[in-house]
Amino acid sequence: MNQEFYNAVKESVQMSQQRWVEWRHEMTGLLHCGSCLSLHKCWFVFEKAPVSPLHEKCHCTTVAIPVSQVKNNAVAKSDYSKYNPYLFDPKNFYRHGKNKAFESWGYTVSDSEWLQKEIEKQGKLQYLLGNYELGALNMRGQRISIRVTIPRKNGTGEVSFITGWMVNPGGEIKLNTPYGGK
């Protein structure tokens, strides 16, 4: 059996066994929590959703949504600027040193478009499979960490690292950082 086909079947079965929920902020009262508002209509695997209630006066709920809705509508997005100039930082403006890791694996700024597409593809797949970890939550939203793997360009083997994302309503995840560490 073709390995790619086998992996696709395995992933489909894994996803069909998951329960997904949509976070709903109930608009009651005059005051609203910024964290709750930022989660409104965001989708999570039930077992990896933020704890509800978030606080003593929380009126939020989670509602089950069909796996098919998630599978058909989820999307991973990233801005090209997260790779060039941010990741490779050719002018040393950001001074984060993230470019050193990618350069040590054989990647250059000319690989930015490929990295963008590959990280989006893997980010979406891992999100759909529930392979993410919750990060910080505040009024800007819920962050998640997703591990991706790319081939080394300057040798054999692969390298795996953490990417950072923000969960947005309707099944969208948006890249915050293409490299959040090993």
State the predicted function of each range.
Residues Q17-T28, H32-G34, Q116-K182:
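Functional cores of ribonucleases/endoribonucleases
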Residues P50-I65, S160-K174:
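C-terminal edge-of-domain segments
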Residues M1-K57, V63-Q126:
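Domain-core detector
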